[in-house]
């Protein structure tokens, strides 16, 4: 468990990818901070708006055999925690479990973990359209790769997500 947590905690950015393909990838920073033994606060922000993350969350990491289950929580009124501030003030009553949004990871090499969403029931409304999230995650000691897409609830066609492959975030 400690290796997985060590790989996941930190600050990551896709600056190289965004500079190489500026019309395909925005420059994004992902921060993961340990706030409990196996609990992580996370945020994602455009590099030019680091003080206004577009996504803030808490993850509980639970090991089940060879798998690491990332239990995803929405933070109610998360603004006070932007830029990873006041994290000691996060309490359980501020968190809402996101049913169907767990990510399951497995160790696939000595320094590699791979996984993704475990169901088709992680619901997100995107521009008024009900979608479910599908993602794949690859994690190493130096890189965090994520492919996210939202699929239409009825037609199962892609509504949002990268057309160009994974976001490749390098450890900072």
Positions of predicted regions on the chain:
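Calycin-type beta-barrel ligand-binding domains and close structural analogs
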Residues: 7, 15-17, 21, 48-172
């Amino acid at each position: 468990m400690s290796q997985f947590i060590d790989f996941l905690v930190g600050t990551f950015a896709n600056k190289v990818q965004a500079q190489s393909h500026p019309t395909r990838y925005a420059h994004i920073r992902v921060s993961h901070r340990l706030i409990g033994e196996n609990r992580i606060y996370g945020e994602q922000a455009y590099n030019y708006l680091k003080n206004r993350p577009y996504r803030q969350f808490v993850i509980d990491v639970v090991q089940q055999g060879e798998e690491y289950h990332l239990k995803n929580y929405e933070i109610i009124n998360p603004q006070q925690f932007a830029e990873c501030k006041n994290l000691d003030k996060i309490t359980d009553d501020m968190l809402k479990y996101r049913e169907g949004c767990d990510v399951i990871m497995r160790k696939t090499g000595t320094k590699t973990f791979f996984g993704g969403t475990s169901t088709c029931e992680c619901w997100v409304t995107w521009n008024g359209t009900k979608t479910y999230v599908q993602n794949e995650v690859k994690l190493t000691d130096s890189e965090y790769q994520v492919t996210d897409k939202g699929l239409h609830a009825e037609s199962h066609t892609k509504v949002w997500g990268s057309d160009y492959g994974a976001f490749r975030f390098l450890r900072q």
